[in-house]
Amino acid sequence: MSNSAKLIDVITKVALPIGIIASGIQYSMYDVKGGSRGVIFDRINGVKQQVVGEGTHFLVPWLQKAIIYDVRTKPKSIATNTGTKDLQMVSLTLRVLHRPEVLQLPAIYQNLGLDYDERVLPSIGNEVLKSIVAQFDAAELITQREIISQKIRKELSTRANEFGIKLEDVSITHMTFGPEFTKAVEQKQIAQQDAERAKFLVEKAEQERQASVIRAEGEAESAEFISKALAKVGDGLLLIRRLEASKDIAQTLANSSNVVYLPSQHSGGGNSESSGSPNSLLLNIGR
């Protein structure tokens, strides 16, 4: 046998075992990255109940397989259309922050698989939403939104725990009502505005009525005062009022450019009350 043939034979005998060993080592090692956990499936014994932490680990190639789960908190949106207590349709969207319970990962893999969240959350989310929304009227969904969110969070967390899922937060991110309810709300707002306007008009009329009463009372008191004054002084008060009125009229006529003042001319045998004195003229005007 030649030297080259011997060399090839030696390399084959050495390299083959080394290759098999290297391949076995490669397939027997696996890494669990940060924020992840591993579950081991054994072809003989099934899913092991021990959860594998972060780092590099070994398994038996072909007989065992590592299933890696992301255990960090992830968001999930759940949308549904449902009816309220007063038979109004409403569209709701929930944002759910969830993660798997680490110790429940073997059971989650056995019962649900890797897509556990897609299998569970939409189903129980719709169930809880329909159940709770049906307990409230459409208007209460708006006025008691925080209370409803708390009830949804509590009920949904309880249901999710049954499947090994931990909910970090649940909140309503979107809420829309049907056109009938929207129209009813608009009509209610218009009715409230009309009621406020009518109330304002009633209050204004009442204020005007009270003002009229006060004004009438004042006029009555003034008339009573004048009557008492007349009873005490007789016609003297009327004469003073006539003089004041005559003075105002004379002043107005004097200031007018279109009026010419002509003194009165009377015969000597005329009535003394009709004499041409200015005072007599003013008194006659006042009368």
Swiss-Prot record:
Residues 264-287 are annotated as: Disordered. The N-terminus is blocked. SMART domains: PHB. Residues 272-287 have a biased composition (Low complexity). Disruption phenotype: Impairs mitophagy; decreases interaction between ATG11 and ATG32. Residues 102-116 are annotated as: Interaction with ATG8. It is found in: Mitochondrion inner membrane. Its main location: mitochondrion. InterPro entries: Band_7 (IPR001107), Band_7/SPFH_dom_sf (IPR036013), Prohibitin (IPR000163). It is a peripheral membrane protein. One of its GO terms (cellular component) is mitochondrial inner membrane. Residues 180-224 form a coiled coil. A motif (AIM) lies at residues 109-112. CDD domains: SPFH_prohibitin (cd03401). The mitochondrial prohibitin complex consists of two subunits (PHB1 and PHB2). The subunits assemble into a membrane-associated ring-shaped supercomplex of approximately 1 mDa. The mitochondrial prohibitin complex interacts with the m-AAA protease, a heterohexamer composed of YTA12/RCA1 and YTA10/AFG3. The mitochondrial prohibitin complex interacts with ATG8 and the interaction may support mitophagosome assembly. Present with 9690 molecules/cell in log phase SD medium. PHB1 subunits are targeted to mitochondria by an unconventional non-cleavable targeting sequence present at their N-terminus. Keywords: Coiled coil, Membrane, Mitochondrion, Mitochondrion inner membrane. Prohibitin probably acts as a holdase/unfoldase for the stabilization of newly synthesized mitochondrial proteins. Involved in mitophagy; may act as an adapter for ATG8 that supports mitophagosome assembly. Negatively regulates the proteolytic processing of ATG32 via the i-AAA protease. Acts as a negative regulator of the m-AAA protease. It holds the Pfam family Band_7. Belongs to the prohibitin family. This is Prohibitin-1. The keyword Coiled coil applies. GO terms for biological process: inner mitochondrial membrane organization; mitochondrion inheritance; mitochondrion organization; mitophagy; negative regulation of proteolysis; protein folding; protein stabilization; substrate localization to autophagosome. The keyword Ribonucleoprotein does not apply.
